Amino acid sequence: MKRICLLALITTMSGCAMLEPIETDEVTQATTVVDAVEGDKSKDESSGIVDTLRGRNDPVAGDPAWAPIHPKQKPEHYAAATGSLFSPEHITDLYDDSKPRGIGDIITVTLDETTSATKSANADLSKTNEAQMDPLQVGGEELKVGGKYNFSYDLNNTNTFAGDSSAKQSNSISGYITVEVIEVLANGNLVIRGEKWMTLNTGDEYIRLSGTIRPDDINFDNTIASNRVSNARIQYSGTGLSQDMQEPGFLARFFNVAL
């Protein structure tokens, strides 16, 4: 009986030891924990042949790769009582802007992207060849073969080509998105990342942005223009029925490729 009780005690203590949390850094913790989002379909199974025929995988809200950063709470340090109300631990510079400097700080990016490209080409080619020879004469008379054909020819050849091509493309996006600082580089630059989801009737629309910024480019109101973001990745699209109706079906894509 004593052996059974001892074995049960050892098993219980081993299980409790396995429940201890594993310490991870802030970035790793943020990218492995998915926030609870209403309507999150990240764990839903694929609909099989439907997704295959659609030819794409729609992004979902709560993707671990876009999870927000949750910095750990720093331990409090109690200073010795000096009788003064001033605390150097909570000092704030009167002339310093409260710009984001650490992991988890937020910043608003002003989306103002406009791109336009135009290309045109014209080509005109023309070539003309002419060759003539008067009839041969011998003794003042034309030399003929069989009394019918003389030795003369007249050749004309003209080649022309005209080509015209043009291409034009333009894109524009404007709006706002608030993102978080996920990493502080050695030179002081900040790596930012964030997304915004909007549910509209039968579908969702999302904006995703990531890149690197300089703290000096941040405005006094904690905003920065999107054209100041280095290595910017901006995604604006949607999911659902409205998005599906904008794309050709499986058979249409098949015949377009086959033909």
Curated annotation (Swiss-Prot):
Coiled-coil regions in this chain?
Answer: none
What job does this protein perform? Assembles around the rod to form the L-ring and probably protects the motor/basal body from shearing forces during rotation.
NCBIfam families the record matches: PRK00249.1-2 (NF001302)
Disordered: region residues: 38-63
**What is the protein name for this chain?**
Flagellar L-ring protein 1
Q: How does it assemble?
A: The basal body constitutes a major portion of the flagellar organelle and consists of four rings (L,P,S, and M) mounted on a central rod.
UniProt signal peptide: 1-15
Record has Hydrolase as a keyword: no
Offer a single GO CC term for the protein: bacterial-type flagellum basal body, distal rod, L ring
Q: Which UniProt keywords apply?
A: Bacterial flagellum, Cell outer membrane, Lipoprotein, Membrane, Palmitate, Signal
Any one GO MF term held by the record is: cytoskeletal motor activity
Pfam families cross-referenced by the UniProt entry:
FlgH
